[in-house]
Every structure is written in structure tokens, then in C-alpha cells.
Amino acid sequence: MEERENSEEGDDGAGEEEEEDQGSGEDGGEVGAEREQEAELKDSLRPSVLDLQLALARLCEDEYQDQPSKMPVLGLQIKDHQFERSFSGNGKVPSPGKIVNELFKEAKEHGAIPIDDTSKSSGAFYRARTFTGRGYKLGDSSKREFEYMQGEDPFEQGQEIQILLKLWSNGFSLDDGELRSYSDPINAEFLESVKKGEIPVELQRLVHGGQVNLDMEDHQDQEYIKPRLKFKAFSGEGKKLGSVTPEIISTPSSPEEEHKRFLNAEVDLDEHVPTTKIQIRLADGTRLIQRFNLSHRIMDVRQFIIHARSDFAQCDFALLTTFPNVELTDETQTLEEADILNTVILQRLK
């Protein structure tokens, strides 16, 4: 009985071992299959020689495209001309009216002040008045008149040059010179300086440090007409004909020069103490130049104006500095205290 049981147990153990061997054999087959699949997958993912060549070609092409092109770009032009910034838009030159209006507008923004309209009714030298000293005074023969002056000591700059700038529908001219186009770069630069209240380089070379009086006339509704040559009558010092004893006479070239004369007889001047020169721009556009002592007061300047021009005796007017534009309200101040030595002051009617 014991032997039979042992044999049965042996049979059972052998069966279990066989089953285990079969199971392990099955597991080993599955692992082997998986490994074969992985090997096949790696082989499929491994690039071929052709794939490597194509990838290398793409890499070279990308690097070439990333490099900046050294070929010139045609049709691209960068211009930085001052006249193009100021007078052109979209490649077009603005109308003459716009150019002229901008000139007056910007000149006013740079310190120009309107002159009293009474200058129109006075009839004395009514024309385009403008720019004196180291700045300008802008004017117009019809509606617009502006004045702009800056800088000190305008009397020690040497000669004085009077220039008339006429603005036409088809260009501008200086004095009786030739027509100059608005679209020309040099001419546009000239006008740009005027707009800024600066002396154009062209005029600086002309006066060599002298004083510039630049008049502006608005003729934008007219085309330029070349002026006829004018005969200038003799003016200055000469001899009177028909006199037994030749008499030396002096004829001023214009009424304006009469007002430029020093009227020292109107002022009690002490030559033994320091003096200064004051230029007075009157409301009618004319001017007076007078020497004063530093101790003279603003009220003395007012009295001088009334004595020199009696038509202002019944007028109420104010005196102002030019740059900045400040009314001289305290007339008991001396010229030195008011800080107006060797300067230009304005008369404005109230």
C-alpha cells in the first residue's frame, strides 16, 4: 500500500514537472517572439543610406537660406532731404498756397507777432515789412503782417541789407531776381530756414555778419512776371545848380531813412556817462533809432516817441520787448533795470 501511494505521488510530481516544463517553454517562445519583433522594428526605424543623404541635403539647404542675402534690393531708395520732409507728401509737392500759408503760420509760431492794423490806414511805407536784427519780421502787402526779432545788440553787425521775398503761385523771387521753383531742393531749404525764423545760409554769405531786413509779400494768386529794369534816381549829397555859390545839399534816398537818423536833439543826453542805442519799431511799420543814457527811464522813451512823431501824442500805446514779447508796464524803471540796452522794442496801439 505504501509503495502504491509513493508511486502515485511520484506520478503526480512528474506530471507537475512536465506541466512546468511546458509552461516555461511557452513563456520562452513568447519572449523570443517579442525580441524578434523589437529587432524588426529597430531595423525599420534605422535610416537607410538614401535617407541620410536626403537629410544632409535638407540641412545644407536650410543653412543656405538662413544666411543674409548679399544681393542688392532694387527699387529701394532712402532719402533724407529736408525739403522732402517739409514740402512733399507721397512724392507730390504741395500747392503754392499751402507752402505760403505754412511759411506765415510757422514763422508766427517761432515768435512772430501781428503789427497793428493802423499801419494800413497811415499810408506811411505801407508794404511788406519784416525781419530786422538777427531775426526776421514777416509781412504781407494785403492781410498778413508779422514781426519777429531776436538777439541783442543789432546795431553792431555792420552793414544792413534789405531783401524782399515775393511768394508767387509758380515759385518765389528775391528782390527783382529770377523765379525760383518751390520744388528745387536748394530753394526748399531756403524757405525751410525762413519758416524756422533763421537766416538762410544764402543770406548769411551775402551780408557777412551784417543786419538782414527780409520782407515777405504774398502773391500766391499771381504768376511771376519778370520786372522791368528800374531807373534809380540819384540820391545823396550833391550840388545845387544855378546858384552863384554852390550849395551843398543832401537828399535822403527814402522817407524811411529820415526815421533812421539819430534824433539826439529830442533827448537830454549826457555824453560823459555810458550810453545805449534803442531801436523803436512803431505801429505804422516805421522805426526810430535813438541813443539814451542807461539812467533814462521807460517814460523817457515814450516822450521821445511823442516828440519825434507828434501824431502819436493823442494815442494810447504800449511799449513791448521783442523776444520774449513782454509789455514794459513799469515806466519808472531805467533802461538798465528793464534790461533793454542795445535792443529793439515795439510800439503797440491799444
UniProtKB/Swiss-Prot annotation:
Q: Where is the composition biased (Acidic residues)?
A: 1-29
Q: Give the gene name.
A: ubxn2b
Q: What is this protein called?
A: UBX domain-containing protein 2B
Residues forming the UBX domain are: 271-348
User: What family does the entry list?
Assistant: Belongs to the NSFL1C family.
Q: What does this protein do?
A: Adapter protein required for Golgi and endoplasmic reticulum biogenesis. Involved in Golgi and endoplasmic reticulum maintenance during interphase and in their reassembly at the end of mitosis. Regulates the centrosomal levels of kinase aurka-a/Aurora A during mitotic progression by promoting aurka-a removal from centrosomes in prophase. Also, regulates spindle orientation during mitosis.
Question: Basic and acidic residues bias located where?
Answer: 32-45
PROSITE patterns of this UniProt entry? SEP (PS51399), UBX (PS50033)
Give the domain of life.
Eukaryota
* Compartment(s) of residence: Nucleus; Cytoplasm, Cytosol; Endoplasmic reticulum; Golgi apparatus
Query: Region entry Disordered: which residue ranges?
Result: 1-46
